[in-house]
Structures are given as C-alpha cells and as structure tokens.
C-alpha cells in the first residue's frame, strides 16, 4: 500500500480563489474589503517570514492589510493599548498577534485582550469555549485547516479512533475538540502519556504536532490509517521535515499529508476564511 498524498497547497489555493471571488462580490455590492491588522513584536526571522507571507496573501486576494511592527523592547502595556485601539477601530475586522511574543510579555493576557469577534486566530477563550460547546464561531486556524483538508478529500472520519500526539493550546487541544465535533472518538497524548506506541498503533486517524523531526516511526502507523503531520522541522542540512517518518509512513497509511505542502498552507487559508467571516459578523452587528 502506498498512501494517497493530501495536497494542502492545492486545497489552500482553491480556498484563496473562493475568498478572492467573495471579496470582489462584496466590493461590487458597495461593501468594504475585509481588513486584517497583523502585529509583529521583535525581529525573530521565522516570525517575520510568516508575517510577510500572511500579508502578501491578504493583499493578493483583495484584503486590506495593516502592518504593526513593534520593537523587541515594547512593553506589555503598550501592546495591550494597541490592541484596544484596534478593537475599537470599526474599519478593522481581524487582529492577528504573531506568536511567540518576547520574554516578559504574557501571551495569554495579550490574546485575551483581543475582541472575540476580531480574534481571527481563534485563540480567545470565548472562541475556544464556543468550539467546546459545539457552537464554533472563529476557529483555531490549523485544526480547522485539517478538518477542511479531510472534507475536501471526501474522507469520512465519523466514528474513527483519532489520536492526537501533542497537547498544545494552539494545535493539540483544539484539534481534539474539532475531531470530537466531527464525530471521532478522540485520544490526546502528551508528555505524561504511557505506551505512546500502543495509542498510535490503534489510531485510524493520527494527527501529530510535537515539533520533533521523525518523532513517530512509520512502523507505528496502523495499516490504512489517515496520517496528518502538522510538524515543521528544519534539519541541519536545510531540509524541512515533519514529525512523522514520511518515507516509512507512506508505505502503511491510506492518506498522508506531506511536509512541506500539507497542513502548513491550510493555516493561512483558514486565517483568510476567518477574516472574511469576521467581516461579515461586523456588518451584521
């Protein structure tokens, strides 16, 4: 068995085209284009790369992109004041704070400061709570992007045993909630989990997000499983790989996402979907 590749680049491009069309329809109807404010604190090269990609994507589909590049020594109070200004700016539909933030700034407090209806990353406790209550509004981008990939490939996951390896607030925990909402029986593993191999071997659907290259050997993959690799790891030789041993896993899985080109593009695609959704909420309110 050789797994079918789940092409995140292709699906992400489809979504961008769909959103661009909807934006043009809004503009023709006399409505404003969606506006996303992206806040970058400091000079982390990876964060700068991600922010540049997000801004270019927004502009390419007709969004208004506002850039706020703050110095590394900005205080938490100053950052919170900027968020308050963006919250009350009626022309701004979405606010994105690029993570991680510098040492000394409380990530949770900053994310909680964003108005829930402008929280296009889906990290605010209100939006996470709505997801837990089976009434999602703005959903965390990477987990929602995974669900979209499965939907676009017509992969039925209802009733499957889903195992999420990694329990981060950004990916693992909301991923578990998304899979539960989709009808899976969900296990979330973490650093205290015993017998990780046994859990992985029982997974009909495996989602891995730990940030460790090749962490899951292909021999652990259940034959015919669906493998979603969210990890992005850069090796010393410059090669980018995921958390799953791809060359081994592809021989056992039924479907698998590559790294790069799998889940990564879907995160940005979901961000623009969320921003358009936030824009629609603003018009209705």
Curated annotation (Swiss-Prot):
GO molecular function terms attached to this record: methenyltetrahydrofolate cyclohydrolase activity; methylenetetrahydrofolate dehydrogenase (NADP+) activity
Listed Gene3D superfamilies: Leucine Dehydrogenase, chain A, domain 1, NAD(P)-binding Rossmann-like Domain
Subunit structure: Homodimer.
A GO cellular-component term linked to this record: cytosol
Top-level taxonomic group: Bacteria
Family membership noted in the UniProt record: Belongs to the tetrahydrofolate dehydrogenase/cyclohydrolase family.
Role this protein plays: Catalyzes the oxidation of 5,10-methylenetetrahydrofolate to 5,10-methenyltetrahydrofolate and then the hydrolysis of 5,10-methenyltetrahydrofolate to 10-formyltetrahydrofolate.
Disulphide-bridged cysteine pairs: none
Enzyme Commission code: 1.5.1.5, 3.5.4.9
Annotated keywords: Amino-acid biosynthesis, Histidine biosynthesis, Hydrolase, Methionine biosynthesis, Multifunctional enzyme, NADP, One-carbon metabolism, Oxidoreductase, Purine biosynthesis
Reactions accelerated catalytically: (6R)-5,10-methylene-5,6,7,8-tetrahydrofolate + NADP(+) = (6R)-5,10-methenyltetrahydrofolate + NADPH; (6R)-5,10-methenyltetrahydrofolate + H2O = (6R)-10-formyltetrahydrofolate + H(+)
PANTHER family named in the record: C-1-TETRAHYDROFOLATE SYNTHASE, CYTOPLASMIC (PTHR48099:SF5), C-1-TETRAHYDROFOLATE SYNTHASE, CYTOPLASMIC-RELATED (PTHR48099)
Matching InterPro entries: Aminoacid_DH-like_N_sf, NAD(P)-bd_dom_sf, THF_DH/CycHdrlase, THF_DH/CycHdrlase_cat_dom, THF_DH/CycHdrlase_CS, THF_DH/CycHdrlase_NAD-bd_dom
The keyword NADP is assigned to this record: yes
Alphabetical list of SUPFAM superfamilies matching this protein: Aminoacid dehydrogenase-like, N-terminal domain, NAD(P)-binding Rossmann-fold domains
Protein name per UniProt: Bifunctional protein FolD
């Amino acid at each position: 068995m050789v797994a079918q590749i789940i092409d995140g680049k292709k699906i992400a491009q489809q979504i961008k085209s769909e959103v661009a069309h909807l934006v043009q329809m809004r503009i023709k109807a006399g409505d404003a284009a969606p506006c996303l404010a992206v806040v970058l604190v400091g000079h982390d090269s990876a964060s700068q790369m991600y922010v540049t990609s997000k801004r270019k994507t927004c502009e390419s589909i007709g969004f208004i992109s506002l850039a706020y590049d703050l110095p590394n020594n900005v205080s938490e109070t100053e950052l919170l004041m900027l968020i308050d200004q963006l919250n009350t700016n009626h022309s701004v539909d979405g606010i994105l704070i690029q993570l991680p933030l510098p040492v000394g700034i409380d990530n949770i407090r900053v994310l909680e400061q964003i108005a829930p209806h402008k929280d296009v990353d889906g990290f605010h406790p209100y939006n996470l709570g709505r997801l837990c209550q089976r009434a999602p509004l703005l959903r965390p981008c990477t987990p929602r992007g995974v669900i979209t990939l499965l939907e676009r490939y017509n992969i039925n996951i209802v009733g499957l045993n889903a195992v999420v390896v990694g329990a981060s607030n950004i990916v693992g925990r909301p991923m578990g909630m998304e899979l539960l909402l989709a009808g899976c029986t969900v296990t979330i593993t973490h650093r205290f989990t015993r017998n990780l191999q046994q859990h992985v071997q029982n997974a009909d659907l495996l989602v891995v997000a730990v940030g460790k290259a090749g962490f899951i050997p292909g021999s652990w993959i259940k034959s015919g499983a669906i493998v979603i690799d969210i990890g992005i790891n850069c090796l010393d030789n410059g090669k980018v790989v995921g958390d799953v041993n791809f060359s081994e896993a592809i021989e056992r899985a039924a479907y698998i996402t590559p790294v790069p080109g799998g889940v990564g593009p879907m995160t940005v695609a979901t961000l623009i979907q969320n921003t358009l959704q936030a824009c629609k909420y603003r018009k209705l309110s």
